[in-house]
Each structure stands twice: as structure tokens, then as C-alpha cells.
């Protein structure tokens, strides 16, 4: 029986699950929102919220815990983004840093898909994109 077993297996080996969570978390930190299957996004939510909590500590141990969970060459870059860009936004919030939005099922295999995004960051990203677009439009051509 599977009583009191935490987490989802996602039909993967332990090392593959670890790599999957690391890659999904990296993508979420860089892009601020990603679209994935519902089971993966539900599992990712706890993983990323733990990383943001580590980043809010703003100490060496928190940075090392983040780098331990984010695999690959970009772990330092992801840790810097979390600590300097994302954590200050959530300094007064105790959890609930991400939001899941259920979307339509995927067309080819009918898998349930959802969008996972940071709660207070999504409007900021849209405003920055609008400012960048207006800067490009007002630029002088050679």
C-alpha cells in the first residue's frame, strides 16, 4: 500500500525525476511562467516554493541549497535570479508564491495541461515587455 508516500513518480526513475524538476524550475525562474502537464506543475509548485523560501534567507547556506537542487551549469545564475530578483518581491509573503491555471487538454494526447507562474511577477513581466516594445517602436532607423 502507498500510505503516506509524498510526491508523484511521474512514470520516471528517481534520477530522471530529479533532472525534470531541476529543468522545469530553471525554466520557470528564467521565463516567470511555463506551460506543462497538470501533474508536473503540481509537483513543481512545492519544489519552486521551497527554492524561493531558501532564496529569501539571503545567506550562503540558502544559496548552496538552491544550487544543490538546480542541476547543471546554470545553477549559479538561477540562484542569483532567485535571490536578487524574485525573493525581494516575496519578502512579506509566507508561501503561495506560484499559481496554477488549468488550460484545455493537449490536442494530440488529451493530457491535462496547466500554466504555472509566479503570483506577483506576471504583471511586472508584461509591463516590461510593453516598455521594451515601445522603446523599439520609437527608435530611429539608420
Q: Over which residues does each language-model region extend?
A:
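Structured, basic alpha/beta domains of bacterial-type, RNA-associated proteins
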Residues: 1-19, 23-142
Amino acid at each position: 500500500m502507498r500510505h503516506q508516500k509524498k510526491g508523484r513518480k511521474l512514470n520516471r526513475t528517481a534520477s530522471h525525476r530529479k533532472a525534470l524538476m531541476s529543468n522545469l524550475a530553471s525554466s520557470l525562474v528564467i521565463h516567470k511562467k511555463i506551460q506543462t502537464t497538470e501533474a508536473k506543475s503540481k509537483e513543481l509548485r512545492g519544489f519552486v516554493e521551497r527554492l524561493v523560501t531558501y532564496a529569501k534567507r539571503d545567506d550562503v547556506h540558502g544559496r548552496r541549497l538552491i544550487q544543490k537542487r538546480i542541476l547543471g551549469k546554470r545553477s549559479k545564475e538561477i540562484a542569483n535570479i532567485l535571490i536578487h530578483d524574485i525573493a525581494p518581491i516575496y519578502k512579506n509573503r509566507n508561501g503561495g508564491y506560484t499559481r496554477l491555471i488549468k488550460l484545455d487538454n493537449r490536442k494530440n494526447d488529451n493530457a491535462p495541461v496547466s500554466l504555472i507562474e509566479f503570483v506577483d511577477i506576471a504583471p511586472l513581466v508584461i509591463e516590461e515587455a510593453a516598455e521594451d516594445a515601445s522603446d523599439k517602436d520609437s527608435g530611429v532607423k539608420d
